[in-house]
Amino acid sequence: RKKNTDCKIIMATSKIERFKEAFKIAAFRFVSKPFFEEEIIDALFDALQTMIGLEPIEFYEKRISYEIPQREVCIVIAYDSFVEALVGKRRMRKDISLKRLMEILDSRLFYQIDRRYVVNLLHVSSYQNGEIIVGEEKFIVSRRRRKEFEKVYREFDVTYGGVK
């Protein structure tokens, strides 16, 4: 479990009393015998739905192209004709408009908080009174987008809250 934290565990057993073990190993789902095809398919589908941000996106650092999983991008900052992405402690760029980039990014994972900044909801450590903290930096959600952000962030937290 410690080696591959992204792995979703679906525990399948004939002994219902083993559900405590499922909690102990942080199983995503518990399925008991007799197995029903629909129940197995639902468990697998739900597990796949939580695996967000794995699609790669191309960014450049010192004119070298890198394929970065979207989940690793913390913040996107728009400039005139390009965007800059904060990936961990690295700053990478891409010659693309913010509008075009938003069409490429996973909409379940990214939210545009104002005309210049897009945040990855996985990396938001706290939100209070229109202020977001991502890593060590603070960002302000525009007043116009505040209510919608709160709704989107709440839904994200309920649906994907344990995902990292």
Q: What annotation goes with each model-predicted range?
A:
Residues 1-54:
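CheY-like receiver
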Residues 11, 32, 86, 93, ...:
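Small/polar loops that bind or transfer phosphate-bearing groups
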Residues 42-138:
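Conserved binding/recognition cores within well-folded domains
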Residues 149-164:
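C-terminal output/interaction extensions
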